[in-house]
Amino acid sequence: MKNIKIWLLLLAVVFSGGCEKDFDAINTNPNRPEDVPLTNVLLSAVSQGVRRTHGASMNMTYAGLWAQHYAKIQYIDEDWYEYRPDAFTAHFDGLYTGPLGDLQSIINKAPDPSNMLAAALTMKAYYFSIITDMWGEVPYTEALDVAVSTTPQYDAQSVIYAGLVRDLKTAASMFGQSDDLGAGDLIYGGDTGKWKKFANSLRARLLNRAKHKDAAFATELQALLANPADLIASNSENAQMSYPDNTVNSNPLYSNKYNDGRNDHAVSKTLVDLMTSISDPRLPVYAEKNDAGNYVGQPNGTVEPNPFTSVSQIGAAFRDDPAGASVLMTYAEVLFIKAEAKNDKQAYLDGIAASCAQHGVTAGAAFLGISGAAYDAAPLRSVISHKWLALFGDGCEAYTEFRRTGFPSEIVEVPESSFPGKGVPTRFAYPTSETGNNKANLEAAIQRQGVDNTGIFSNPMWWKL
């Protein structure tokens, strides 16, 4: 009942002025009442943003597809790396002018210190981390404030990461004030202790990703990992947004299949083959058997004659449950970060076990034995490959970790690529809206990063190993 009331409140917020405007109108939306309670603004920012980052387009059709968690079984253009420019424009503009605009409004108005301010800083860092990981250089220091600039400069990823790490450290130190987050907290239901752990864990994610680029990041990461109680320490503390058990405000992947009538994706052959080779107990959760009773993944970029019956559909827990959660960060990921940063085999095995437990299965001795032997032979490859498996359902993070490390190495250019020889796309294409609104700064960023005329291939991201 509490969840239903929260989502009814969200509908009220959306219809009372949560509409999106052009990039240069952030913080000046005349349809957004200035006296809306901050908890309502937080609710809108979290709901709109997470539904976008974990929705069918950004999560499945692009990031999750290019990370080869999923494969297209019809309308497979994106599996050939042909993209729709309006999709990337919608995601880029939608994150800036919706959730980030709302969060900046909270930051401008919330008492300092306060739990509300800390939550807004945390979610702002979360969204910006995804934006820069997908697009590289983006507006950051001059963004979200038209008083500073209506044509904000594009900042280097090193600048953005440093700012996000600072904000997350500030947020973690601030949680524990007396103010109530109210009904707007769709992540932890007002538990600021868990919010603090999420802020610290997200900081660990960013520090780990860039530790080889900045010695101070590596030092800060080791200090953070030395205090595991300050991080997500169990599956009960996972950062996730759940949905009411109805078809109206449902899990966006469920909504895409049942409300929109789309069934364009299956699990990838890359995923199924890797899980089968190690007898992974999560396979029945991630995938459905085909009509012949077998687990068969769809080869990325390939047209199958009878894909709806011959290959495995996405597991029911992810696609067929209207109340299924969108997961932002997990205990398993924290353990994999520790395993990589500290060369800790036990943390790696614990991460595998935590991911299995998250999905209601047991990591048996035989499975852990296979995984342990793989670690002994190739530690980093094993850690990232299992991290990629644990990230199923979080396409953006899986895509980022593959681009950072090159693992799993089973992910390769599809045979029918529209850009043969270029490999897997290195980035999302910049939005067409910026060509008209911020052309000079956009073109300078494109030149600095070596973005070619496809828009999706460039120099490696700053954090590439």
Model-identified regions with their sequence ranges:
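C-terminal functional modules
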Residues: 352-356, 363, 368-465
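Bacterial Sec-dependent N-terminal signal peptides
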Residues: 1-28
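Membrane-proximal, proline-rich intrinsically disordered regions
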Residues: 19-67, 75, 79-82, 94, ...
